[in-house]
Amino acid sequence: ADSVVLLAQDYHVVQIVYDGHGETGEDFISVETTVDEVTDWLQAHSITRLNAAYGCSLGGACLTRFLALGKIPVERAVIDAGITPYRMPLILRRLACLRDDLGFRLIAKSRKVLETVYPPERWTMPGRDPVKEYDALAAYLKTYSKRTVRNIFWSANNYTLPTKPAETGCQ
């Protein structure tokens, strides 16, 4: 969030908050639905190109699909730890989704597990209070509905891409 404030001093910034990640109470449905909604919103606001786009994790998956569809040109893109669809049999994809779903629930339920899997001394930014950071993170993880968690893990690993991605010249 600090980077958004800094960038907004010199650029017009659009920050996407996906369903299931904010305070709307709506569940996340899919990468495809999210990308369609973002594209529709940008077009409705007469945004016909983007100078830059950034996506991390699920955001990287959404940005990957957004770029592949090529409905709105993007000059530069950064995909950080972006998720691409699995290329394995359905049964293995279902087992991976179950593993991820159960792992998330365990981390969200137990502060001890959260801190064991993601040690605060490694994941807390310098100068920040790890107790406050992890209090906020633990509270935030509890806001996800079971449906949102399941849909995120299923969709992020199984979304569709066009057979031939759009040629946009994005760097």
Regions found by a protein language model. Name each.
Residues A1-E23:
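Conserved HGGG/HGGXW glycine-rich cap/lid loop of the alpha/beta-hydrolase fold
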Residues D2, R65-L69:
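Active-site signature of alpha/beta-hydrolase-fold catalytic machinery across serine-
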Residues Q15-Y54:
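Active-site loop/oxyanion-hole signature of alpha/beta-hydrolase fold enzymes
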Residues T24, L63-T64, R87-M88:
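Glycine/Thr-rich phosphate-binding loops of Rossmann-like dinucleotide-binding domains
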Residues Y54-L63:
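Gly/Ala-rich beta-loop-alpha elbow adjacent to hydrolase catalytic centers
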Residues A68, V74-L106:
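Flexible "cap/lid" loop of the alpha/beta hydrolase fold
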Residues M88-P89, A108-A166:
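Conserved alpha/beta-hydrolase catalytic His-Asp/Glu region
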Residues G169-Q171:
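Catalytic His-Asp charge-relay segment
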